[in-house]
Amino acid sequence: MAMAMGHVMLREFHLDNPSQYFTDYVRRYTDMPMLVMLEERDGYYAAGRMLRAADLVDSLGQENNPEWKTVAINSNGDMVAPNGSIGFRWGEKGKWNLEQRDGTSGDETELQLSLLGSQDDIAEVGFPYFGGEGTEHFSKVELENILLHKLPVKRLQLADGSTALVTTVYDLTMANYGLERGLNDENCATSYDDVKAYTPAWAEKITGVSRSQIVRIAREFADNADKTHGRSMIIVGAGLNHW
């Protein structure tokens, strides 16, 4: 059900009617803008590791720990190694923070969350799906074990001469949640009533909670977080991590 709530929140507060607070938060304080290298599989791609400054020609000017510095694309279309990744922890002062600054120049920079609209190509990326395995106590929704989604990608020349396809964590997240963004992705939903991975209708079949209730609680939870700048909380009972 939490996945279906996430589907609603991302659809309504990031795509259809973007919340300035949410957008600014994920841009500044999460790895959503960071680039991820895609690995070739049998007829499709899969998410690999983060792109690092050391993967690129001249390491984006980073001489200190470039193999530990993640990379993003800023609003000007330039690749940068922004402050805050673990590579800035040692050997440099004043850069292990979440200020929106280029780690090389120190200039303020705004990171792109998505490659959509500036992509070099569209690639099919596979995501594992585990909701098709049911038991007598767990209802299932049978879909393919690997769900292929269409993602915007950039094609980069690496320091070793090879070429890599990259996308952002944000784009991977949107695809994994099954959110259609104009790419004609048959495994993405165009309605909350579509029984596709992580929609309210999908969750209703597994949990028995009506899709309308899932949509309502997700919408209210996100709306409160938007208006109060994050003051929404899910409280669970005592468990393994409680103590």
What are these regions (language model features)?
Residues 230-234:
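Generic beta-sheet signal
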Residues 1-227:
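Long, well-ordered, tryptophan-enriched scaffold segments
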Residues 202-206, 236-243:
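Conserved short loop/turn motifs at secondary-structure junctions
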